[in-house]
């Protein structure tokens, strides 16, 4: 049975609407939409909320691109895809809050299909969500991972541990030997047991992101902070930039397929700083972050 591509696209566009609506309700600000077309085929809707009451920048992007040949980043680990036409669609978002006590969050759900005449289509879903705190709170991490586990539960006991580990492995800065944050879920190449089940799981992850994130935002948004906390937040945002530009497959795929650069780099924090050989003061809350983001079972 050929996957229902239109059904997936309809869901993704609705998901973008829903997430923007919920983030706006929390922030009080509005998203500004930029619709764009891709010369080689496809296009998308980029929505950005800037300098809001809670979020310094929140970007929620929908894209649907297609082409006659696969880019190198996609065929590197799937050589059988070379020479096929493809369609890729997804919703990708990153939220950078004003307050250092509210973590940055990222979520993504996507669908990919590659076809050639006389052969069965090759398709899969991917996605997940992950959390990057600047100051660690155990109850937030537990809530985040408990929500992730509850999303996975109906699809099998083994699903959460498998995709949690994949997330921990993926969001790792090899050159720093540290995690990007406390993880969450990450899955890719999902095409089993059948289209409907895989699609249902992708929907559950996409819809579950706000359940995981917004209670944490509400809990931390009014915590007082000063220059020290803000400086540390900007310094740690540097790790986000490093990961996205050096290790992230999605960024590479977007740039190699001639995607819209502004939308691809929408995940970048609006302000960031680096400091040579920075060492937080021993025993400080800033120093505690290194231990907090180490891989562990939160629930």
From Swiss-Prot:
EC number: 1.3.3.3
Binding site for a divalent metal cation: 96, 106, 145, 175
UniProt-annotated stretches for the region Important for dimerization: 240-275
GO MF annotation terms: coproporphyrinogen oxidase activity; metal ion binding; protein homodimerization activity
GO cellular component, one term: cytoplasm
Record note on quaternary structure: Homodimer.
General function of this protein: Involved in the heme biosynthesis. Catalyzes the aerobic oxidative decarboxylation of propionate groups of rings A and B of coproporphyrinogen-III to yield the vinyl groups in protoporphyrinogen-IX.
Family: Belongs to the aerobic coproporphyrinogen-III oxidase family.
PANTHER family: COPROPORPHYRINOGEN III OXIDASE, MITOCHONDRIAL (PTHR10755), OXYGEN-DEPENDENT COPROPORPHYRINOGEN-III OXIDASE, MITOCHONDRIAL (PTHR10755:SF0)
Protein known as: Oxygen-dependent coproporphyrinogen-III oxidase
Organism in which the protein naturally occurs: Enterobacter sp. (strain 638)
């Amino acid at each position: 049975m050929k996957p229902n591509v239109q059904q997936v696209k309809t869901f993704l566009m609705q998901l973008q609407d829903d997430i923007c609506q919920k983030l706006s309700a929390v922030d009080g600000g509005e998203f500004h939409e930029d619709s764009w077309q891709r010369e080689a085929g496809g296009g998308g809707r980029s929505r950005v909320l800037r300098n809001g009451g809670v979020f310094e920048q929140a970007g929620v992007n929908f894209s649907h691109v297609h082409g006659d040949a696969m880019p190198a980043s996609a065929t590197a680990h799937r050589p059988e895809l070379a020479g096929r036409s493809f369609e890729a669609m997804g919703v990708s978002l990153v939220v950078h809050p004003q307050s250092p006590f509210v973590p940055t969050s990222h979520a993504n759900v996507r669908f990919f299909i590659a076809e050639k005449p006389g052969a069965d289509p090759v398709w899969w879903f991917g996605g997940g969500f992950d959390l990057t705190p600047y100051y660690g709170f155990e109850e937030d991490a537990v809530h985040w991972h408990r929500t992730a586990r509850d999303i996975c539960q109906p699809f099998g006991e083994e699903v959460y541990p498998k995709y949690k580990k994949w997330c921990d492995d993926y969001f790792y800065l090899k050159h720093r030997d540290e995690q990007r944050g406390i993880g969450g879920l990450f899955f890719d190449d999902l095409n089993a047991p059948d289209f409907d089940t895989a699609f249902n799981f992708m929907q559950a992850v996409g819809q579950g992101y706000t359940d995981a994130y917004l209670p944490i935002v509400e809990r931390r948004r009014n915590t007082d902070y000063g220059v020290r906390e803000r400086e540390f937040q900007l310094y740690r945002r540097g790790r986000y930039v490093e990961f996205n530009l050096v290790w992230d497959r999605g960024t590479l795929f977007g740039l190699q397929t001639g995607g819209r650069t502004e939308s691809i780099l929408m995940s970048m924090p609006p302000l960031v700083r680096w400091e040579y050989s920075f060492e937080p003061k021993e025993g400080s809350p800033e120093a505690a972050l290194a231990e907090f983001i180490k891989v562990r079972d939160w629930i």
